[in-house]
């Protein structure tokens, strides 16, 4: 008829329509005109359907229950146990995760003293921080309790533990609540503690305070206590510190028998020993003097009691989840905190700067010609705009050395840096052709100080096709607007394909909406993992430059991300490593995919540049092709944004294990899915992926470091 151990000893019945005995009880209840039935089951079921992620079908199929509250003369329709808890506790997530909630449900908590203890017990029940509550208090509600105990005039004269249990039953009829309405005594304390994991002591009797702690210490049960003045909370971890002195040793070797029957005034010296009179608020300390004079009881405020309840609830959660919590005491002093109010700092990144627009312009040309070529080289793109090169301009040559100190976890085996070196050399060739000094280029992977070195020997070449790209090269930029998909003319497709081939690479364009959307899903999932991998997250955030940052000559200016003010605030949150660590711990963060998914899906085409070969020279050759395609695409009215999934330069599972150990398996699956989509061929290696779309010019352009002359190394 009733669910075992659920509803406790409050007299509540949980009944179901498909149980014969329960149906008989329900029929009797319905026949009683003094009993009201309330059925809002459909509204509760709608709450189940709203759950995210979508609940299992069996949760929706749980049979309706009826909870009978005899003290209210009411029967209320409720969801089944699983559905009820899922909906009621849903707003706890992820402050308390579903897994943590299940762990806490195994916790058995006792509360002694249900004046201040009422708020604590109710808070624990509301948070779902335990599966069983055991409440003990012999006292009855008086009118003077109503300044702090959340009950009403209808409850005056009723047992405090019973009233607390009833409120909790109305909150959660499935929560097991055991009552001890006779209070505690030396004879009953062991029975009360039996099976408890935590006990919270909020009683007035000093002898019971001592006896309870002595028994809890013997059983290894931790004791928590909140004292309302200045938010004092005591933690005594007898479970991890066997034999720890009770009350932290503040009472010495006290005899509990001598504390029995003391008047309120006689308790004051002992209370002051426990609370440390020097730490009491002035109002509380002065009130102690007035006990039995102008006051007959301890003064307490409801707000202070609820502060204590919140603090104790946090302590219970820590114990239940095995999180760090030492013995000791702390004050959560709201009054003192309000004395330390600060003016909030003005936002350093307000909305005004979002409106700034800095269109790209071709810079004035420096002299001599070798420096013109060098300045063109450093305008090349690179991952995170880290500019992983050293450029040495001499009278008869230009050398671009890969700078290994600028590598990152995603720059696997320097392949991304090699692509950047190749792009820089392409720019140099374009500038050299425009100034009629184009010469031969050679790549060298044998130098001890650099994994790759590219050198152009100036000559008298003036390749017209390269020279024609000079101004478009100077105006090339990354465009991160959301953009709009549009038609890419077949002639443009052919031109871009031939442009890549002229540099010894292959270009593939995904043009169908289905292919683009599939790629968007894969690339977005990889970007989520980039956020959730600690090292990758740290490196990604270190690349961002916010207005007011000391140096904007490297990295990515956040204005170039083309985010609105709300998106920028979210990005500001995502800069915090502790935030993304929590998302990773919970295996959440699907919202981190949205930006990439939406932008890639808004593309006119997705371009992939390949090389057939895996040396750094091959990747540099691919970088030249990538840069050529980028310049020509922009020249023909297309906006370009590179996409760099973590797996871009990975050649096997080992590379992915190094880049993101926890998510390597997922990344490997994503890489396989992407290659299944694009089919690069057995020898094909991706150099870069970028989206082509239609959009206005970027708000700002990435800057470059000021180039200083770099001497030749000693040989």
From Swiss-Prot:
InterPro entries: Nitroreductase-like, ThiF/MoeB/HesA, ThiF_NAD_FAD-bd, Ubiquitin-activating_enz. Pfam families: ThiF. Coiled coil: none annotated. GO terms for molecular function: oxidoreductase activity; tRNA threonylcarbamoyladenosine dehydratase; ubiquitin-like modifier activating enzyme activity. GO terms for cellular component: plasma membrane. GO terms for biological process: cyclic threonylcarbamoyladenosine biosynthetic process. This is Uncharacterized protein Rv1355c. It comes from Mycobacterium tuberculosis (strain ATCC 25618 / H37Rv).
